[in-house]
Amino acid sequence: MNIGVNQFCFPMSYDVADAVKAAKRLGFDSIEVCFTAADGARPGGGVTDALDISGYHNRLLNTNSTDADVSELKKLADDTGIRISSVGGIVSFTIYPLTAQDPQTARKSMDAVKKMLDSARILGADTVLVIPGMLTADMEYQAAYDLAQERVARLAAHAPDIQLAVENVWNGMLYSPLEMSR
């Protein structure tokens, strides 16, 4: 059995390196590191603010992290003796929703999740946790669902060696197991 922990379980003052070391010290086998957009990209008044996780900003892997940054984190985890099992984050939820109808936001969302997938490969993680966007007042449910399904499929094709896990959260869609199974 592998027992892991998500980076968000640690204090906001911990950067990703602190969280990796603390996870090992606390006896965890693995850690899910979190990913976000580069500073200044998040919208005001969104879920990031409501959950008060904005203080984590720039303590996470982000869209500006280089392959060298990610490789350095991999080396730290290896030297610490802990596995990075997955990469997760809210970048595809409220920052750049996968369901965005605006072409620029949609491109940023796809690019961000591709960066998560590429980072997972460098880290030796086999899973990326993605939130499939969100439903807003100006969207029809089926249109948002179709966009999410199409974009998740394209992302899965980008990195077939990485599992793409879809997280069901308070995003206004995927209310039942039936929807998740389609």
State the predicted function of each range.
Residues 9, 34-35, 88:
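Residue-level recognition of beta-strand->loop/alpha-helix junctions
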Residues 4-6, 31, 165:
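Conserved Rossmann-like nucleotide-binding pocket used by diverse enzymes
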Residues 17-39, 123-126:
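Catalytic domains of carbohydrate-active enzymes, especially glycoside hydrolases
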Residues 78-86, 92-182:
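Active-site acidic/histidine proton-transfer and metal-coordination neighborhood
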Residues 13-17, 66-71, 174-177:
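Structural motif corresponding to alpha-helix initiation and N-cap regions
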Residues 32-78, 132-139:
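Glycine-rich, proline-tolerant flexible connector loops at the mouths of alpha/beta enzymes
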Residues 1-14:
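Boundary/entry segment of secreted carbohydrate-active catalytic domains
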